[in-house]
């Protein structure tokens, strides 16, 4: 069933580009190393000022962080990078990536990011007292209000995320498949990433156990190493 849905998603994605964008509607290709754990980054972000937007900007701002960017945004970008480094180096995450079959091993990082966001969405009450739908509503309002700080190449992602409630859709298997199809449409080289949903189906319980072991450690890491807004130019 899932294999038939990616062509439809491509049509919907094309249609979404015709929506009134937040700033720009220029398509952007993705690198396989581009992280996709949006929900995790947003939950871990400081919920003040521009930190929610900054928690997503880490994938779109490369190199030294421009001093012209507001300090809370800079700090959130630096935290995003620290979270990614901690995640990529963690033995549990490496174990999860090794569960991915050779066919999709090149995209194991993307798949695990998205799968972990699925488990975060389905196990949300274990990590937040705020209902998920309330959280996503708050996030979308914040992103709209502060979108003028986002780089052009980030605008299409924000537009799609908000219009299609990407974060809320992570609770359902079909939502994860749609997310993978959306990523597939933006990869630099042809792939069948949408079919990667079978990796979640086949390894669901093991991957969920990995996530439930890992995420509390990530939360502790963030709490133990806060980023100061002073000199956050990493």
Feature annotation, model-predicted:
Residues 137-220, 224:
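An amphipathic alpha-helical core segment
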Residues 34-121, 204, 212-225:
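An N-terminal structural lobe/cap that precedes and organizes the functional/catalytic core
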Residues 102-164:
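Active-site-proximal alpha-helical scaffolds that flank and shape metal-associated catalytic sites
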Residues 18-20, 28:
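Low-complexity, intrinsically disordered or signal/transmembrane-proximal segments
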